[in-house]
Swiss-Prot record:
Binding partners and assembly: Heterotetramer of 2 different alpha chains and 2 identical beta chains. The subunit composition could comprise of any combination of 2 out of 4 different alpha units with an invariant beta unit.
Lineage, opening ranks: Eukaryota, Cryptophyceae, Pyrenomonadales, Pyrenomonadaceae, Rhodomonas
Keyword Thylakoid attributed: yes
InterPro entries per the UniProt record, alphabetical: Globular_prot_asu/bsu (IPR011070), Phycoerythr-like_a_sf (IPR037011), Phycoerythr_a (IPR004228), TAT_signal (IPR006311)
Modified residues (5-hydroxylysine): K56
Membrane topology: Peripheral membrane protein
GO biological process, alphabetically ordered: photosynthesis
Species for this entry: Rhodomonas sp. (strain CS 24) (Chroomonas sp. (strain CS24))
Function: Light-harvesting photosynthetic tetrapyrrole chromophore-protein from the phycobiliprotein complex.
Family named by the database record: Belongs to the phycoerythrin family.
Protein name, entry field: Phycoerythrin alpha-3 chain, chloroplastic
Compartmental location: Plastid, Chloroplast thylakoid membrane
Cellular component annotations (GO), alphabetically ordered: chloroplast thylakoid membrane; phycobilisome
Length: 128
């Protein structure tokens, strides 16, 4: 705790050294108040435990860009109001979709990635 207080006072002191107007205008009372404020805040600066959790929903953003400029087909993807310009023929759709991959596809990709790796001591195998 003493180290944190000392570090916060050092930061305040270095800020006062680089700002001449601040160091000229600060009296002893302001320095003591700043030090007291830093000492009061220091216990609250301790790190909080991380609240991150793995999202197991297997959802990923799916971005689809529609560009119907110059196309004779009537666009049916958008149901909103028209702007009256070429922007009526363009749209970006963003959806959160569930990603599904079969175990066999995953095994094939893993094998493909492993074959690309070669270490200093030879090809990568699961026994290395």
């Amino acid at each position: 705790m003493f180290a944190k207080t000392l570090a916060s006072l050092a930061v305040i002191g270095s800020a006062a050294a680089y700002v001449p107007m601040m160091s000229m205008d600060m009296g002893r009372r302001e320095v003591v108040q700043a030090g007291a404020a830093a000492a009061a805040v220091t216990p609250f600066l301790s790190g909080a435990p991380a609240g991150a959790a793995m999202d197991k929903s297997a959802k990923a953003p799916q971005i689809t860009i529609f560009d119907h400029r110059g196309c004779s087909r009537a666009p049916k993807e958008s149901t909103g109001g028209k702007a009256g310009g070429q922007d009526d023929e363009m749209m970006v759709k963003v959806a959160s979709t569930k990603v599904t991959v079969s175990e066999s596809d995953a095994a094939k990709k893993l094998q493909e990635f492993i074959t690309f790796e070669k270490g200093i001591d030879g090809p990568f195998t699961s026994k290395n």
